[in-house]
Amino acid sequence: MSFRKVNIIIWVLAVVLFLLVLHHNFLSLSSLLKNDISDSGIVGLQPIDFVASAHQHPVSERQEEIPVVIAASEDRLGGTIAAINSVHQNTRSNVMFYIVTFNSTADHLRSWLNSGSLKSIRYKIVNFDTKLLEGKVKQDPDQGESMKPLTFARFYLPILVPSAKKAIYMDDDVIVQGDILALYNTPLKPGHAAAFSEDCDSASTKVIIRGAGNQYNYIGYLDYKKERIRKLSMKASTCSFNPGVFVANLTEWKRQNVTNQLEKWMKLNVEEGLYSRTLAGSITTPPLLIVFYQQHSTIDPMWNVRHLGSSAGKRYSPQFVKAAKLLHWNGHFKPWGRTASYADVWEKWYIPDPTGKFSLIRRHMDTSNIK
């Protein structure tokens, strides 16, 4: 065999070997890309829980159950119904509502839920045991609504939804305009048990209360004259957050014994009066601020556009209200009351009580005036 033929054979074998290696690498890359796509799920969304060296999966429509916890007080039941309806109508996800109430309200609530457009929702009615609060809450007539037992349901999420790894909590004075799936997929940093909307965010406005200045930082909620508070070395100017809407990593919540920590500060407040004397917001906020100081993630501010109930006037433009993912009527002017801002927006989601026990106050007043 001539030297020329040997060179040709060697060259052909080299080309074949190169093509085989290239083909193998292409198959490996294709497999890797396929795995990456399946692990990523919905673009831009983050995992439920952080687990070191493990794949992380955001929830997609109709995949994993999304637990939504909301309280149902007899005198505010219309708010709960409107909030649930707004969530239900704006998502195709597998939502399970955990509605926290008392046995005395359960039948009324059930009859409302089983009528009309809410027949198809999935829900569980959970009775709240007030014994949980014994020795932890100091009765103060000036606090009004914030002293009601169901206000503290948010502290006991692992008890209310024991099998869930993650959950959303929301107050009864909200309307959801976005897909709750997006809120549920809020990314929580490693070691964080909850994500809140901070009061200094761009979608919030600073509220003036009782001459105490702007209640958007820690000094507006805690009494920094008390030694126990000072010993915590928390900056008084730290931005506070709103606990009316939040996402909780319940695995991390349990690991850190968050409920026990909250109860500890509730008891200490009863004994020592640690909360600010000018406190205008919910008394659930101070213990949460202490426990989650610099240890919480944040939700998109458009998922808690608040202060709609701070006054009867309109503080936001119609365009901004329409763009909001969640509207929050925190404050004294509730959308089912005599006067409220953007009541027409809230009323789109309200379903009249089939039993007639609950009625909108302003509508009742209008009827009385006509008569």
Swiss-Prot record:
Sugar attachment sites: N257
Keyword presence, Membrane: yes
Record's GO cellular component terms: membrane
Membrane topology classification: Single-pass type II membrane protein
Major location (coarse): membrane
Statement: the UniProt record of this protein carries the keyword rRNA processing: no
GO molecular function terms listed in the Swiss-Prot or TrEMBL record: UDP-glycosyltransferase activity
CDD domains (alphabetical): GT8_like_1
Topological domain spans for side Lumenal: 29-371
Family: Belongs to the glycosyltransferase 8 family.
Transmembrane annotation, as ranges: 8-28
Signal peptide: none
Gene encoding the protein: Glt8d1
Residues exposed to the Cytoplasmic side: 1-7
Top-tier EC class: transferase
Protein name (record): Glycosyltransferase 8 domain-containing protein 1
Pfam families, per database record: Glyco_transf_8
Subcellular localization, as worded in the UniProt entry: Membrane
Keyword tags: Glycoprotein, Glycosyltransferase, Membrane, Signal-anchor, Transferase, Transmembrane, Transmembrane helix
Annotated EC: 2.4.1.-
